[in-house]
Structures are given as structure tokens and as C-alpha cells.
Curated annotation (Swiss-Prot):
Gene3D superfamilies linked to this entry: Winged helix-like DNA-binding domain superfamily/Winged helix DNA-binding domain (1.10.10.10)
Source species taxonomy: Bacteria, Bacillati, Bacillota, Bacilli, Lactobacillales
Stored InterPro entries: RNA_pol_sigma_r3/r4-like, UPF0122, UPF0122_fam_protein, WH-like_DNA-bd_sf
Top-level taxon: Bacteria
General function of this protein: Might take part in the signal recognition particle (SRP) pathway. This is inferred from the conservation of its genetic proximity to ftsY/ffh. May be a regulatory protein.
Short name of one Pfam family: UPF0122
The name this protein goes by in its record: UPF0122 protein llmg_1069
NCBIfam families per UniProt: PRK00118.1-1, PRK00118.1-4, PRK00118.1-6, YlxM
UniProt family annotation: Belongs to the UPF0122 family.
HAMAP family, sorted: UPF0122
Amino acid sequence: MEIEKTNRMNTLFEFYATLLTDKQMNYIELYYADDYSLAEIAEEFNISRQAVYDNIKRTEKVLESYEEKLHLFSNYVVRNQLLEELMKKYPSDQYLISKLQEIQQIDEEEF
């Protein structure tokens, strides 16, 4: 499994997990976050390896679809880049820096 895809799926999962069914959440979390194999997940839930694979592939598409429609992750990335740029551009403005850090903290608490 390629690391970029794993990282992306883990990140999308963080943003959209609450929109998934319990089964989708379990399979994706075990597969991507906990690095379980398809066989291990199948054994855990007493289903076929193919059923796990199919569910994971469908859930990946669902997560990508949510991001395509809602843009939570991409907006988060852009927002953080802008905050970092402002902090670098105005490092001596302590009031601005503190407010920018508050914004970052809000983002971190949400996700």
C-alpha cells in the first residue's frame, strides 16, 4: 500500500468519519490506521476477504466524494498555509500572532 494513499485516507477519515456507517468506519480504521490486512479484518468480522475489500474500496470512493463536495480537507490545508504565511510576514505583531494561533487551535480541536 502506498504511503501517500494511506496518509490521504487517514486524513479524509479524520474529517469525514462521522458521515460513515459504523461498518465503514471500522474497516477503514483497521485497514489504514491500524494496518490490518484484509484477511485479519475478515477474520475479525467473520466475513470474506472479498467483502472487506469491496467495502473498503466503496468507502474510499465515498470519502473522496465527500471531499470533492465539501472541501473540508483542502480548505484546511489552504487555511493553515495562509496562517503560516501571516505569522512569518508579521512575526513582531504579537496581537496578530496570538489571534492566528487561536484560529489554528480552533482548527486543531475540530479535527
